[in-house]
């Protein structure tokens, strides 16, 4: 079974879905403590025509509930930040709620999570790029993939097609997780190639995704 293209190493703790027909909707209904699951044998859904090395970034408009949509970019050194990240405290994504649990590292259940990490495109307080995500989603789920892409670009000066899609169930204000896809362009995925669903969960906490209310399990 394909987990990664040659030369591409996944972060530890992956859960392979196996059946390439298993979709994101199926993953949303699954439970468990894994940070992410592999989709479509780890092959992203980009087309041949998508594989262009011209840098760009696109962030979908917020919907009627104030929720983010797809964030999509061809990432290269041209887009990466040249200064430290500023404050994002003025942005309150859909479902934003400040709540603490003593057993969570940093205490806070929710973070303002960038769909495309600041280290990749230097987008900071962009409301179209920030969701309400758990500490676990942010640090254990998304960050290892972001770091992998950033390190690859810095080392090779190549470009990576990168797309993150928040998945909401109905009118929920908090997404169930995010679909992350990436593929390196110049080497046709030999360096970076993944397609994963990262769960917006926090071990030990039950989350009401419709409202963002929560309680310790």
What do the PLM-derived regions correspond to, one by one?
Residues 3-7:
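C-terminal motif of bacterial Sec signal peptides marking the signal peptidase cleavage site
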Residues 10-55:
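N-terminal, intrinsically disordered, polar/charged segments of Gram-positive cell-envelope systems
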Residues 46-217:
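Domain-level detector of nuclease and nuclease-like folds
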């Amino acid at each position: 079974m394909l987990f990664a293209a040659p030369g591409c190493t996944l972060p530890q703790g992956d859960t392979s879905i196996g059946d390439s027909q298993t979709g994101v909707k199926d993953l949303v209904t699954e439970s468990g403590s894994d940070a992410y699951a592999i989709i479509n044998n780890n092959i992203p859904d980009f087309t041949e025509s998508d594989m262009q090395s011209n840098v760009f970034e696109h962030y979908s408009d917020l919907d009627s509930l104030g929720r983010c949509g797809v964030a999509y970019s061809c990432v290269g050194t041209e887009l990466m930040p040249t200064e430290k990240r500023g404050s994002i405290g003025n942005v309150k994504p859909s479902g934003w709620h400040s709540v603490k649990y003593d057993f969570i590292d940093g205490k806070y259940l929710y973070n303002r999570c960038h769909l495309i990490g600041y280290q990749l495109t230097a987008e900071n307080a962009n409301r179209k790029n920030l969701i309400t995500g758990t500490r676990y989603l942010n640090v254990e789920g998304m960050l290892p993939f972001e770091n992998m892409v950033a390190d690859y670009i810095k080392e090779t000066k190549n470009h990576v097609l990168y797309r993150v899609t928040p998945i909401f169930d109905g009118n929920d204000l908090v997404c169930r997780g995010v679909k992350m896809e990436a593929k390196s362009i110049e080497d046709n995925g030999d360096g970076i190639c993944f397609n994963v669903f990262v769960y917006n969960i926090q071990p030990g906490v039950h989350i009401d995704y419709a409202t963002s209310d929560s309680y310790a399990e």
